[in-house]
């Protein structure tokens, strides 16, 4: 059935001849529209080679390519003969099409045109973030050493800079600043020019302060905004108290405050700095008689008393705002500020000098080592495009440049793409409301500028809005609109959430599907506003416990599912639920709480690889080998299960030498203890390997000598632990292959990964599909879930970027704190105050967009969980104050100063509900008065269910465990004896099934199909009454000898050779390995990695493998590389009597196995499975032996066939292909 597109979707598909910006809101079918646009262009004769399609992740590019391939194949089935050939050509060239990340495309330009800029083509991409940081650190260390040199002409200025941010012995802070400044510059096409301009705000030109660009452009707007908001607040108070005679003096006091604010507003426009400062310092007393005796004693004036109390709070708020101005911008007079600016200019000038020196040195080092990093890609590609001939050539290659997720683009990437464009063929798709990658230098203003410009009638370019939301149940969409039509505008959020920017509910759900937008507020008693670590933990635990309880209850309900029959409803499954968080910090507690409640979980993207016990211990061993004079790693290694020194032995080591470090004490202790001496001998052996710079050999030697791999296999989660250790070996090999060597540098590399929040996920293992998914909001972007939970909604926004001695903001530049050397006084410069305010707006805007992403992930039900203190939060930032001020606000959007005061998603949400009817919140926070009308853009049809729960009443649910009840008094009733007799006399109905293995491998049960009587001839067991009875379990008697029993004299078994041959065929690259030498190389690598025994390797028939690789069937495999599956595991249930003729019942048996390989032909919807066999076949009797071979494995292969047929519904699984390697024949098994 063809997709029915909306009017705007159709426009987005068909429009051409302009630059086009598609503003695609959440759930608007953006990807479907993109693919349809591409397909329509292809059907009109435009080749996929004529498209440049860029997005921001490799996964997104891969998905785009796959979806386009599926769409072409679909059209191919219904195409006429004239189109078929063209579409088939498109499928052939699709793998080489320009569908990639922007960096990948820039790399392609460099690889093709490197000669234009004189670049050595033998470069390596520095894609490892930790490796790049290490190289940066080494280069920076050398650069700083040069500036520390007294002979350097900038030495004195440099020392002043160092002392402003630390001291020569502790310049870590300065190093971080230089690296961060460099990163900002690298995200721009004009990086060097941007750095040079950072001095400008600090230049003292002699002109009055209020005439400088810094004041006119930045400081004055901030002052006027604050004053405007305060005047508005004062006017609202005056309206409230007008006509109340008892508050006449209060009215006079507010008139005085109003006159004061109006005076400052005027002077900010024209007065010199010192005159303005004097006016601001002359604050009115603001004394009000808000609680006179007459008001208190008259019960009829209780409402007036409440108003008076509120007014007092408003006065406190006004004074607080003015005090913040006085203690920041107006802390100094003009002469003092100019002195601070002058000295700060010297700091900034030196900082830029050092940063430029670092950038140049880093660039030179990369060239010398033939390295390119990701920022280089865009810069060098632009340098190539500066050649006019090359630029015109590249521009002529593309009919259209399609940019997905355009809101996440940075300035350098924008410049690159516009350089490739011919000026009217850019097709940009995105949603600025979902721009959440500011930490990667994403520039949402690039989107918003076009959003406004392209909407103008005189513009040659066009904007198309896709606002229809086909994902979320209408109530979720309406509440999302209710919130954002009040908090997101151009000043906070970068776009006014109104008109076309709003979501339009279009999702088709039946009326009986529950409309759930639930807010759980946990109320906690607290006397102090400042939270201790214990309070944070208890608050978090309470939220997680409540969340677990909600999930368990949801499992008893139903959700809508279009695939469900007959009513479209089915029970809620764990996999329907996602928990989205702002950060990963609470994951350990969250997972623990959910699992304790019996809820399975799957955690996405948690970097905890280096924290796993088995890997952490290996890193400690490496640290000890590199430098044994580290007490903590050494003690950890000794105490570990590998060496098993107990507390008494550790104490004895310390006693052996109390004066020196622990390593020296261990050496002394080893003179009288063999166990300690053995440890020293091992460390010495490993150190000798380490000195040879063979990191890979060292790690494997540790595994060999300690049997650590085998040990962890016996621990809980043993397979995962072994995978982690194998992964460490692979990381080391990759590191070493990248021309790096040395244990010390590898340890630094790992520590860089850890300290840079770049920890890796554990080695991949199969995950439980039926589990609640836990991920960050960032990771959830682009995904959707039937039910979404948002815990820790009260968590304060991260303000780390607003702190520190130097702040950087892409538009305002850098703000520095100047430390006066003599007085050691730290003074935030005016520029720093401006930058800090800009950073706060930028950070709050990003948080607002993150909130939008979080809310729009939910399809049917959304649950918010947060905690609130009922005491301790004083002043105008208290939740009650925010509620009241929001309730009394005028206009569509809540006042900006209120939105900036709120510091959590919960506060924004509650503020948005203040002007709606919500009885629970009004009873809790309100004053009983009716709210002001909310703006016309805000829908009032949505329903928010609010639940208030005391934290002390929450208890985490625990999964129930069934067990027998204990009788404590030792007495038993007749009912107990009857129950016991029933249990003892119980006859199990399926006794035969207990004598049959419920879990059987295909390689074992294939013997039954080979000889049906074999089941009767299996090992018999003797029962207690002396009767013989078959065990009904198939066994493989041939087991490899353990290493300590194998002296090398025993010839490897044929099965061992067969296993090794299978391993080679499992790992071989059909497209590259096609010679005897290449197969032998792979075999030798597997021997070196100890995956094939040295005694087995010579027995592998290389010629047989090569003959197969050159066969027609191998060519079929190569043609289906994209759909080829090797070593595919499966499991399926079969009735026992289908396998065991001796059984009468049909009790289920779990069959598991591994298929050597199969490939899928999407065009014909068929599957071909194949299986390698190394059995000996006699050439003289080849037909007879092949017939026996076919009979021997027929049952096994038919089980594989059944398994694939169950997995691929709608596909036809053909006859299995048995590959007899010994004679190079492929047999079709009927």
Curated annotation (Swiss-Prot):
What family name appears in the similarity comment?
Belongs to the helicase family. AddA subfamily.
The protein's matches in InterPro entries, at most eight in alphabetical order, are given as: AddA, DNA_helicase_UvrD-like_C, DNA_helicase_UvrD/REP, P-loop_NTPase, PDDEXK-like_dom_sf, PDDEXK_AddAB-type, Restrct_endonuc-II-like, UvrD-like_ATP-bd
Q: Which cofactor does it need?
A: Mg(2+)
What is the recorded function of this protein according to its Swiss-Prot or TrEMBL entry?
The heterodimer acts as both an ATP-dependent DNA helicase and an ATP-dependent, dual-direction single-stranded exonuclease. Recognizes the chi site generating a DNA molecule suitable for the initiation of homologous recombination. The AddA nuclease domain is required for chi fragment generation; this subunit has the helicase and 3' -> 5' nuclease activities.
- Keyword Ion transport, does the record have it? no
What SUPFAM superfamilies does the record tag this protein with?
P-loop containing nucleoside triphosphate hydrolases, Restriction endonuclease-like
Q: Where does ATP bind?
A: 24-31
Name recorded for this polypeptide:
ATP-dependent helicase/nuclease subunit A
User: Could you tell me which cysteines form disulfide bridges?
Assistant: none
Q: Which domain of life is it from?
A: Bacteria
Q: Which GO terms describe its molecular function?
A: 3'-5' DNA helicase activity; 3'-5' exonuclease activity; ATP binding; ATP hydrolysis activity; double-stranded DNA binding
* Catalytic reactions on record: Couples ATP hydrolysis with the unwinding of duplex DNA by translocating in the 3'-5' direction; ATP + H2O = ADP + phosphate + H(+)
Listed GO cellular component terms?
A: cytosol; DNA helicase complex
Please tell me the species this chain comes from.
Leuconostoc mesenteroides subsp. mesenteroides (strain ATCC 8293 / DSM 20343 / BCRC 11652 / CCM 1803 / JCM 6124 / NCDO 523 / NBRC 100496 / NCIMB 8023 / NCTC 12954 / NRRL B-1118 / 37Y)
UniProt keyword annotation of Zinc-finger present? no
């Amino acid at each position: 059935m063809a997709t029915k597109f909306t009017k705007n979707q159709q426009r987005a598909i068909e429009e051409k001849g302009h630059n086009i910006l598609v503003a695609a809101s959440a759930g608007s079918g953006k990807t479907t529209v993109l693919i349809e646009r591409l397909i329509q262009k292809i059907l009109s004769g435009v080749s996929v080679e004529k498209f440049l399609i860029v997005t921001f992740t490799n996964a997104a590019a891969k998905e785009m390519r796959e979806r386009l391939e599926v769409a072409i194949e679909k059209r191919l089935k219904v195409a006429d003969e004239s189109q078929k050939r063209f579409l088939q050509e498109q499928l052939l060239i699709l793998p080489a099409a320009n569908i990639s990340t922007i960096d990948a495309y820039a790399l392609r330009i460099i690889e093709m045109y490197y000669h234009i800029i004189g670049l050595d083509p033998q470069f390596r991409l520095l894609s490892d973030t930790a490796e790049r940081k290490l190289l940066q650190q080494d280069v920076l260390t050398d650069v700083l050493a040069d500036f520390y040199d007294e002979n350097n002409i900038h030495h004195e200025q440099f020392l002043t800079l160092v002392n402003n941010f630390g001291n020569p012995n502790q310049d870590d802070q300065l190093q971080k600043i230089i690296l961060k400044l460099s990163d900002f510059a690298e995200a721009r096409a004009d990086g060097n020019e941007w750095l040079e301009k950072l001095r400008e705000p600090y230049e003292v030109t002699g002109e009055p302060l209020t005439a400088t660009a810094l004041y006119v452009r930045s400081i004055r707007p901030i002052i006027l905004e604050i004053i405007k908001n305060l005047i508005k607040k004062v006017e609202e108070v005056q309206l409230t108290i007008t006509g109340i005679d008892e508050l006449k003096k209060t009215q006079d006091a507010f008139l005085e405050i109003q006159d004061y604010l109006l005076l400052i507003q005027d002077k900010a426009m024209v007065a010199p700095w010192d005159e303005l400062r004097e006016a601001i310092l002359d604050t009115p007393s603001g004394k009000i008689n808000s609680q006179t005796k007459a008001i208190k004693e008259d019960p009829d004036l209780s409402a007036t008393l409440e108003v008076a109390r509120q007014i007092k709070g408003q006065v406190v708020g006004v004074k607080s705002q003015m005090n913040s101005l006085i203690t920041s911008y107006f802390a100094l007079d003009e002469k003092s500020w100019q002195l601070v600016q002058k000295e700060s200019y010297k700091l900034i000038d030196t900082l830029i000098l050092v940063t430029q020196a670092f950038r140049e040195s880093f660039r030179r080092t990369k060239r010398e080592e033939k390295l390119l990093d990701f920022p280089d890609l865009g810069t060098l590609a632009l340098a190539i495009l500066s050649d006019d001939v090359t630029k015109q050539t590249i521009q002529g290659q593309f009919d259209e440049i399609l940019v997905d997720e355009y809101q996440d683009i940075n300035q350098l990437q924008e410049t690159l793409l516009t350089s490739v464009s011919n000026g009217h063929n850019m097709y940009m798709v995105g949603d600025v409301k979902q721009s959440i990658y500011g930490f990667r230098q994403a520039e949402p203003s690039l989107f918003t500028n076009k959003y406004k410009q392209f909407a103008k009638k005189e513009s040659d370019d066009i904007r198309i809005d896709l606002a229809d939301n086909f994902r979320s149940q209408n109530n979720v969409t309406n509440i999302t609109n209710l919130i954002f039509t009040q908090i997101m505008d151009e000043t906070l959020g970068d776009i006014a959430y109104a008109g076309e920017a709003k979501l339009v509910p279009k999702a088709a759900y039946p009326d009986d599907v529950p409309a759930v937008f639930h807010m759980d507020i946990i109320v906690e008693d607290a006397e102090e506003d400042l939270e201790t670590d214990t309070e944070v933990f208890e608050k978090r635990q309470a939220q997680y416990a409540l969340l677990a309880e909600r999930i368990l209850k949801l499992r008893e309900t139903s959700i809508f599912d279009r695939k469900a029959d007959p009513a479209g409803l089915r029970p809620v499954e764990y996999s329907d639920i996602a928990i989205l968080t702002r950060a990963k910090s609470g994951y350990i507690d969250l997972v623990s709480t959910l699992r304790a409640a019996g809820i399975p979980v799957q955690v996405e993207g948690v970097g905890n690889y280096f924290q796993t016990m088995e890997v952490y211990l290996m890193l400690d061993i490496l640290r000890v080998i590199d430098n044994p004079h580290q007490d903590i790693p050494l003690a950890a290694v000794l105490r570990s299960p590998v060496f098993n020194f107990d507390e008494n032995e550790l104490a004895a080591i310390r006693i052996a030498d109390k004066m020196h470090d622990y390593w020296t004490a261990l050496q002394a202790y080893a003179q009288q203890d063999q166990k300690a001496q053995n440890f020293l001998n091992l460390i010495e052996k490993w150190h000798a390997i380490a000195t040879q710079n063979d990191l890979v050999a060292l790690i494997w030697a540790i595994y060999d000598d300690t049997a650590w791999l085998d040990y962890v296999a016996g621990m809980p989660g043993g397979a995962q632990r072994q995978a982690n250790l194998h992964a460490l070996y692979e990381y080391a090999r990759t590191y070493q292959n990248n021309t790096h060597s040395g244990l010390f540098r590898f340890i630094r590399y790992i520590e860089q990964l850890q300290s840079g929040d770049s920890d890796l996920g554990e080695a991949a293992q199969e995950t439980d599909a039926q589990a609640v998914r836990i991920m960050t909001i960032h990771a959830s972007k682009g995904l959707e879930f039937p039910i979404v939970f948002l815990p820790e909604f009260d968590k304060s926004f991260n303000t780390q970027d607003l702190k520190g001695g130097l702040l950087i903001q892409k538009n305002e530049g850098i703000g520095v704190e100047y430390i006066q050397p003599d007085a050691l006084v730290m003074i935030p410069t005016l520029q720093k105050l401006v930058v800090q305010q800009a950073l706060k707006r930028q950070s709050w805007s990003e948080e607002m967009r993150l909130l939008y992403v979080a809310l729009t992930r939910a399809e049917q039900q959304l649950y918010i969980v947060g905690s609130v203190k009922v005491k301790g939060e004083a002043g105008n930032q208290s939740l009650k104050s925010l509620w009241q001020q929001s309730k009394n606000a005028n206009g569509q959007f809540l006042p900006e100063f209120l939105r900036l005061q709120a510091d959590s998603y919960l506060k924004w949400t509650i503020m948005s509900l203040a002007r709606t009817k919500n009885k629970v919140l009004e009873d809790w926070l309100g004053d009983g008065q009716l709210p002001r009308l909310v703006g016309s853009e805000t829908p009032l049809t949505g329903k928010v269910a609010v639940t208030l729960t005391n934290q002390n009443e929450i208890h985490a649910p625990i999964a129930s465990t069934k067990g027998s009840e204990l009788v404590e008094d030792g007495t038993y009733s007749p009912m107990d004896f009857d129950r016991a007799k029933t249990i003892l006399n119980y006859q199990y109905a399926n006794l035969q099934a207990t004598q049959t293995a419920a879990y059987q491998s295909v390689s074992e049960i294939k013997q039954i199909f080979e000889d049906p009587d074999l089941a009767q001839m299996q090992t018999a067991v003797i029962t207690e009454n002396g009767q013989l009875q078959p065990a009904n379990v198939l066994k493989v008697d041939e087991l490899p000898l353990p290493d300590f029993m194998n002296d090398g004299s025993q010839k490897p078994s044929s099965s061992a050779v067969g296993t090794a041959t299978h391993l080679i065929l499992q790992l071989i690259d059909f497209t590259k390995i096609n010679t005897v030498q290449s197969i032998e190389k792979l075999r030798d690598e597997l021997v070196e990695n100890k995956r094939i025994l040295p005694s087995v390797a010579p027995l592998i028939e290389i010629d047989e493998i090569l003959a197969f690789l050159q066969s027609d069937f191998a060519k079929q495999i190569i043609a289906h590389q994209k759909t080829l599956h090797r070593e595919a595991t499966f499991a399926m249930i079969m009735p026992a009597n289908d396998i065991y003729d001796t059984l009468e019942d049909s009790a289920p048996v779990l069959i598991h196995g591994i298929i050597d390989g199969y490939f899928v032909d999407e065009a014909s919807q068929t599957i071909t499975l194949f299986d390698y066999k190394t059995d000996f076949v006699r050439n003289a009797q080849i037909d007879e032996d092949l017939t026996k071979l076919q009979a021997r494995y027929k049952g096994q292969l038919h089980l594989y066939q059944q398994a694939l047929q169950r997995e691929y519904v709608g596909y036809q699984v053909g006859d299995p292909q048995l590959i007899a390697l010994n004679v190079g024949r492929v047999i079709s098994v009927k």
